[in-house]
Each structure stands twice: as C-alpha cells, then as structure tokens.
C-alpha cells in the first residue's frame, strides 16, 4: 500500500524502488522472493521503477552468489541500485592481506554489477559509511574496518578497488592520489 500511496500522491517524476538486504544469500530465495514481490505489486497496477540491494557483505562472501544475484536482478528490466555497500574484514586490526581482499571484493562487486546490469538500468552504487573511525560506526559493524578510509581518514586499498571497478581498468597509471 505504501508504494501505491507514494505513486498516487508523490511527485509524478519520482522513481520508486523496493529495497532489501541479503539478496546475495546462498539459496537466492530472498532475491527471487523480492523479484516476485515486485511482479505482484505491479500486478495490482502500481509501477515499480527499480530494485535496490543493500550489500553488507564480507571479504569471504560467496562470489558466485553475488554474480547470481546480479544476473537475476539484471533480468528484471528494472533500474538496479546497490544502496548500501560495505565489506567487512572481520577484524578491527586488518592485515595487509585482509585489506587486499577487501579491495578485491569491492572491485568484484562493481565488476559484476557492470557485467550483469544493463548500462541503461544501472542506477548507481552507494558506499555505506565513510571511514573506519569508531565514532562513525560504533552502532554499525563495531570492531571491524568495512569502509574505504581508515580510522585516520587515509585511503585504504579498498578505495583503489572501487576506482578500478568504476573505471573498468587499473587506474594506477592515471591516478596520482591527489584530490585537487
């Protein structure tokens, strides 16, 4: 009913998404259930413009499940948004290897998004959180380091993983690291 009221009383140019977490789960039931729910809502005469996926995942999340989720979402013909992406390293004191795995997973998610979601249906990727500073996520994933900047606001390997994924190539030769 909420989406029906939003469509009825909202701005006619508003894009309405149905968003959920855990769509990359092992058996894909939640992803398929959400896709079926969107079809159900539309069968009642209410247009749904897109589907959002909150991706609070970890460095050891199953990559095949992530790819399958994006394949299924891409096949809907809807706009697709990754609305909350963060990648846990499962420790508050990550090693260099943990940080490299995190960067690789960030890049993998973006690569799979770009591979399976048609370009005209890619509505964007939002990174959840800024830094690993405890004050920023004391109530969300405490004792971990899920973000692109460390606790002192220095870029982590994950930042480059995102940049490489968005660029579709290794940006090391093109990127000086300067923000100006």
Which residues does each predicted region cover?
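Well-ordered, non-membrane alpha-helical segments in soluble/globular domains
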Residues: 1, 31-37, 103-108
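Aromatic- and acid-rich polysaccharide-binding/catalytic face
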Residues: 9, 14-20, 34-61, 66-91
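Short, electropositive alpha-helical surface patch
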Residues: 26-41, 139-150
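Short acidic, gly/pro-rich beta-turn/loop elements at beta-sheet edges
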Residues: 26-28, 61-63, 135
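Aromatic-lined carbohydrate-recognition surfaces of secreted/lumenal glycan-active proteins
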Residues: 1-31, 81-84, 124-130
């Amino acid at each position: 009913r909420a989406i029906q009221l939003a469509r009825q009383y909202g701005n006619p140019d508003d894009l309405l998404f149905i968003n959920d977490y855990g769509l990359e789960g092992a058996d894909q039931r939640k992803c398929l259930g959400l896709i079926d729910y969107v079809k159900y809502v539309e069968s009642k005469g209410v247009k749904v413009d897109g589907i959002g996926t909150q991706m609070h995942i970890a460095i050891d999340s199953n990559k095949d499940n992530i790819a399958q989720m994006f394949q299924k979402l891409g096949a809907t013909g809807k706009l697709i948004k990754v609305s909350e992406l963060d990648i846990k390293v499962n420790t508050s004191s990550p090693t260099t290897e943990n940080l490299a795995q995190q960067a690789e997973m960030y890049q993998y998610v973006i690569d799979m998004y770009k591979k399976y979601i048609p370009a005209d249906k890619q509505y964007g990727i939002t990174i959840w959180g800024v830094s690993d500073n405890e004050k920023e996520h004391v109530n969300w994933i405490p004792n971990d380091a899920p973000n692109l900047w460390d606790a002192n606001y220095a870029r982590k390997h994950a930042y480059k993983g995102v940049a490489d994924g968005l660029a579709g190539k290794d940006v090391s030769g093109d990127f000086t690291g300067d923000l100006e």
